[in-house]
Regions:
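Active-site flanking residues adjacent to catalytic metal/cofactor-binding acidic residues
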Residues: 6-8, 51, 160
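Short, glycine/acidic-enriched loop or turn micro-motifs at the edges of active sites
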Residues: 12, 55, 164
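Active-site alpha/beta core segments
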Residues: 31-130
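Histidine-anchored nucleotide/phosphate-binding helix
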Residues: 35-39, 140-151
């Protein structure tokens, strides 16, 4: 069974208090994300990571404060979540070469990761039998990712102690919606590497 670990938006602007759109207490999940990513790479499990990469005048800033502007400190993934040998796929249509990359970082500009021009092709090329999802924000990008992945008909597990939300109530609603929609919920200790 081929597993893909899916690391959603583990970027400085979301994870750290100095970030432009800090998610309360999100820095607490950085070690869990880092361990998941390193463990996956050590066992040959692909890590598919997403990152916001906004323009300075991005339309999303009418809803949210400016954050993850391409090239800024806050747009970069937390260093601990990076895997050596990674590749980055920009937020524009392009050729994709995934062979041998332990971590594939896909840039996006919207909360729905499946609107990124390359994500569906990457998911198709990885041809997973199941997905393990973690990152930020539980009730926004993580939820969109899980909904999109569930449409593939493959099992999706959310690692509940490796996600962070804006509020506990929003997190509980999102996780219940994921479970009710066919997703599985598990903790870091319950997730194997195969």
């Amino acid at each position: 069974m081929k597993t893909v670990f899916f690391d959603i938006d583990s970027q400085r602007d979301f994870l750290y208090p100095a970030g432009a759109l800090y998610v309360p207490h999100a820095e607490r999940i950085v070690p869990a994300i880092a361990r998941r990513n390193r463990l996956a790479a050590a066992h040959g499990i692909p890590v598919l990571s997403t990152t916001d990469a906004h323009a300075e005048d991005d339309p999303e800033f009418s809803v949210w404060p400016p954050h993850c502007v391409a090239g800024t400190w806050g747009q970069h993934k937390a260093q601990a979540t990076l895997v050596d040998g990674r590749i980055t796929i920009p937020n524009r249509a392009c050729d994709i070469a995934l062979e041998g990359a332990p971590q594939i970082v896909v840039e996006k500009q919207t909360v729905d990761i499946f609107l990124a021009p390359n994500l569906a092709r990457v998911v198709e090329r990885l041809d997973a039998d199941r997905y393990v999802v973690y990152g930020v924000v539980t009730e926004i990008c993580v939820l969109y990712a899980v909904r999109g992945l569930l449409k593939t008909g493959k099992p999706v597990t959310v690692v509940t102690d490796a996600v962070a939300a804006l509020t506990a109530e929003a997190s509980a609603r999102a996780l219940e919606g994921i479970r009710a929609g066919g997703g599985r919920l598990a903790t870091v200790s319950e997730i194997g590497v195969t």
